[in-house]
Each structure stands twice: as C-alpha cells, then as structure tokens.
A protein has these predicted regions:
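Nucleotide phosphate-binding site architecture
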Residues: 11, 50, 88
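Short acidic/polar alpha-helix capping motifs at helix-coil junctions
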Residues: 11-12, 29-33
C-alpha cells in the first residue's frame, strides 16, 4: 500500500476539476488502484512521461482528463490533474 502525497498544485487542480463538473468518483477509483498497487486497466492508457516530466507517469481518467503521478519508495506523489492543455501547454 502506497501513502498518497498531494502537491499543492494537485489540490488546486482537483478544485478546478470539481468546478468543471467532472465526476470525481472516476479520479477516486484511479487513486484507489494506485494506492493499492493494483495493475491499471488498459483504458487508463498509463505511460511514462518525457522531458520536464521525466520520472512521472500519466494516466487518462477520461480522454482529456489526466493524472500525472510518480511512485517513489512507498509514496504515491500526486503532481497534477487536468486537461492536456492545462498540463502541457504551459
């Protein structure tokens, strides 16, 4: 079991997703799988990131709603969540 750690920006991103009317149960389902270290279904399209996000992974909650995270030792680091443009057009 991993211990989740939310970055400050992740908390702000969650609030933004809630305001957009996203179904937060989908995010909680993904987080539960990650915390329990269970394999993710293919539908999440989980993959490693490159460039400035090297060392992190990206999982798709919906086609244009992503979670960026990293597993380090016994910790699940939750970095960002949002759309492709929220996360990569900065």
């Amino acid at each position: 079991v991993l211990t989740p750690r939310q970055h400050g920006q992740f908390k702000r991103d969650v609030r933004k997703s809630e305001k957009r009317g996203k179904d937060m149960r989908k995010l909680r389902t993904l987080l539960a799988l990650l915390i329990e270290e269970k394999p993710l279904p293919e539908s999440y399209r989980d993959h490693p990131l490159k460039g400035s996000w090297a060392g992190f992974r990206d999982a798709h909650i919906e086609p244009d709603w992503l979670l960026i995270y990293r597993v380090s030792d016994d910790e699940l680091q939750l970095a960002r969540t949002g759309t492709h443009s929220d996360l990569f057009d900065e």
